[in-house]
A protein has these predicted regions:
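Alpha4 helix (beta4-alpha4-beta5 surface) of REC/receiver domains from two-component response regulators
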Residues: 55, 72-88
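C-terminal output helix
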Residues: 92-102
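Conserved phosphotransfer microenvironments
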Residues: 14, 38-63, 72-73
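The C-terminal output helix
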Residues: 102-116
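Two-component/phosphorelay signaling modules centered on CheY-like receiver
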Residues: 10-30
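Helix N-cap/capping motif at the beta->alpha junctions
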Residues: 30-35, 53
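Conserved sequence signature across two-component system core domains
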Residues: 7-8, 31, 44
Length: 116
């Protein structure tokens, strides 16, 4: 079971994202602000609308945690430079989130890179 951080400012959408994560057999972790240094997660679903959300994503990406962005807007340069595992434009079908999350979690980001 993976731990998936949910960083979404809208309560109704956050609840839906948590439901999808649970349905896939993973543990949703709600992000309510604060320090991420001691937060251990395997992936994150983030709405990158505010600078603080991008900082959360930047912190997680620095630890090689895969990040999926969800937004009503097309991806901006700030979001794309973080190399998200996926960028889903709202509204999107839930199966798109399921597939993107499963793909992100299937990659062992902590394994050493293959050489040769």
């Amino acid at each position: 079971m993976a731990r998936v951080l949910i960083c979404e400012p809208h309560d109704d959408i956050s609840a839906l994202l948590e439901l999808v994560v649970r349905r896939l057999g993973h543990e949703p972790v709600a992000f309510v602000g604060g320090d991420l240094e001691h937060v251990s997660v395997d992936a994150a679903v983030i709405e990158p609308g505010e600078q603080s959300s991008l900082e959360v994503a930047r912190s997680l990406r620095s630890r090689n945690v895969p990040v999926l962005f969800t937004s009503i807007y097309p991806p901006g340069a700030d979001a794309l430079e973080l190399k998200p595992a996926a960028y889903l434009v709202k509204p999107f079908p839930l199966y798109a989130l399921e597939r993107a999350l499963q793909a992100a979690l299937a990659v062992d980001v902590h394994a050493p890179a293959a050489v040769g």
